[in-house]
Structures are given as C-alpha cells and as structure tokens.
C-alpha cells in the first residue's frame, strides 16, 4: 500500500533537556526504549501504512538525522523557538494532504489509520483513555494536562488551555494531526497574521505551540475535528517516562 499523496512532517528539532543525560549527544527523538529509538519506531509505523514521503524538521544535533535517509530541513533557531515556528521552517512543504507529528511520541498502526480515515480539513488525534496514563506519569494529572472540549458534532471547541478540573479534559492532545490543502491554507493565514498581531495566538509566533494555532483556528470558526483513539501511544518527555514500566508496556503497540 502506498499513500503517495500524503506527506508526513516530523517535528524533531527538540533538545530534550528533561531527558538528560540521554540527550547529551543526540536529538530527543533518537532516545531509545528497549533498544530502538522513538523516531525509528514512528518511522516503522508510517512505512507500514505506505507513508514514505517524510520530511524531518531538525534542530539540535540535526546532522544525526541524516542516517534515516529522508529530507531534512533545519530550524537553526531551535533553542529559542517552539513547535509552531519549527513547522513553518518547512512552509514550502505545506501543500496537499499533510500529517504533522511530534518526534517524542510513538503510536500504533490503529492510531495512524484512524487519522488517515478522517476527511476533515483539520483533524487531530485525541486519546479518550488518557487519564490512567497521565496518572502514571504525574501525581496530579492536572499538572501537565490541557483543556480539550468536544462538541456533539465531534469538532473541538477548546484546546490547550489550563484546566481547572478533569471535566474540562475530554481527551488528551497527542501531537499528531492531519491537514488537507484547504486546512493548510487556513493555518498559513493564521500564522502570518500572528506575526503582525500577537493577540491572534496569545503570544508571539516564535514561542507558540501547535495547540495555540489550533485554538486560533477554532476561534476563527474553522472546523477542527477530533479523531478519538483509546490509548496505544506514548510520549517521552522525562527520564521518568523513559524508565517507567508503563512506557515499556505501552511500547508493545
């Protein structure tokens, strides 16, 4: 199977300071679990779904990514910018249908298939079974969680804010999304407008998260569709994540 018309952009510029010493000599995405790196695990899932048109946007120790044989674009300002800025370092690649994925996550084939099945212009995977996973990573799940509210029609009405209670979290944002060409035009307009007007994202574009972009899209009445999944993914942010039995159990996707 070949998904030739779908490009995948991997945001792999991260330094992974909270994963030191494991990231002293490599990008965050190249940290290994059970003998295989996060990025290798992700590429394996993508390849099995026929997703071979991959672009990596690197930063920290960017040259190490060359071993994978894919196109690399460098965010030379990785140390002072955030996810959204990293994505737009590859603005020339934002055409047609594009999957955008963080580099510090791994997901199962069922997760990527659910995303591929969505016909929405902006589709975002969310973990409905997030709470038990978050409790295994944090004493208080609200410490590292963000709001995510979903309308009856399945579109997201709010994302990325600080929650006051668990009731404001109807799923966990995973860092995996898909845009149609129309959806890409919508986010490009938001991004370029935000450079001139800091109020659009609530912060300057250089320091904005992807969730800031998605929230701005929602505010401007663009449909952002939730793609619900139930577990079958991991995120590795800290040494504790890397070493936990939960991570090692869930990595058997």
Give the location of each predicted region.
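Conserved N-terminal catalytic core of the sugar/cofactor nucleotidyltransferase
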Residues: 1-10, 18, 32, 36-100, ...
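Conserved alpha/beta core of the MobA/IspD/sugar-nucleotide pyrophosphorylase nucleotidyltransferase superfamily
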Residues: 2-8, 159-160, 166-253
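Phosphate- and divalent-cation-binding pockets in alpha/beta enzyme and binding domains
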Residues: 18, 64-65, 110, 186, ...
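Conserved beta-strand segments of alpha/beta enzyme cores
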Residues: 29, 53, 71, 155, ...
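Conserved core of the sugar-phosphate nucleotidyltransferase
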Residues: 68, 109-190
